[in-house]
């Protein structure tokens, strides 16, 4: 019986884990392309620099904590501790929902500050130099309270406003795309986590078979690491 269970476990590993790794490699390529595009676009034309929403820090803490709880679930399953598996998976699912909620609150803050998915430079609210700055071809612009000027034009003789007319706030668009695509993939992770939660409540994970839980945990850790990368990238690139 033990040998048969081991064979089933190994068979599931062979069938499911390669699919998971293919999905994760594809995501690495996708986000690598998006962040590369971010860097290239930032150095060209107008670019708005602003602080990330405070709720994104909350998102980071929640998803890191969820990685801890899903690891606890896997450890509990290896020991056939059904009760701990249920609690740990449930906590992970709740923390995942909290992450989504905090992201939504972060987007709400962006909208309140005039940073829209498709918006112009004139939509931005706040004090220039404190809440945001604008760069042109990599150079931060000067602002005299009325018009914008290139940094070398310290006597404010040649305003650059005509070039700014009709320009989009590309930086906020990139922010929505990066976080939105991550949320979309995390949504898939939450659906998988829901299936795992149902199985955990039915006490299906134990020392002999926890493949589904392990695969979900690996994918969840990946999403965690991906978000931390995006958060640090966005925080320091700004």
Regions found by a protein language model. Give the residues of each.
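...captures the hydrophobic TM-helix bundle architecture rather than a specific catalytic motif
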Residues: 1-238
């Amino acid at each position: 019986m033990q040998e048969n269970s081991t064979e089933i476990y190994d068979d599931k590993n062979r069938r499911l884990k390669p699919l998971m790794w293919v999905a994760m490699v594809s995501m690495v390529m996708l986000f690598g392309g998006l962040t590369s595009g971010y860097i290239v676009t930032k150095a060209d034309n107008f670019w708005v620099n602003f602080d990330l929403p405070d709720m994104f820090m909350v998102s980071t803490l929640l998803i890191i904590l969820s990685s801890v709880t899903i690891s606890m679930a896997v450890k509990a399953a290896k020991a056939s501790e059904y009760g701990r598996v249920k609690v740990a998976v449930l906590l992970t699912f709740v923390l995942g929902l909290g992450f989504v909620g905090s992201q939504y609150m972060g987007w709400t803050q962006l909208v309140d500050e005039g940073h829209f998915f498709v918006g112009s430079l004139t939509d931005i609210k706040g004090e220039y130099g404190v809440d945001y700055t604008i760069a042109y071809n990599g150079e931060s612009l000067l602002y005299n309270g009325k018009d914008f000027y290139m940094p070398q034009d310290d006597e404010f003789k040649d305003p650059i406003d005509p070039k700014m007319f009709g320009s989009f706030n590309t930086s906020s668009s990139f922010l929505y795309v990066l976080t939105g695509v991550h949320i979309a993939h995390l949504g898939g992770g939450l659906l998988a986590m829901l299936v795992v939660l149902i199985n955990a409540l039915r006490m299906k994970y134990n020392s002999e078979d926890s493949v589904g839980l392990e695969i979900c945990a690996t994918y969840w850790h990946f999403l965690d690491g991906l978000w931390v990368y995006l958060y640090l990238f966005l925080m320091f690139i700004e």
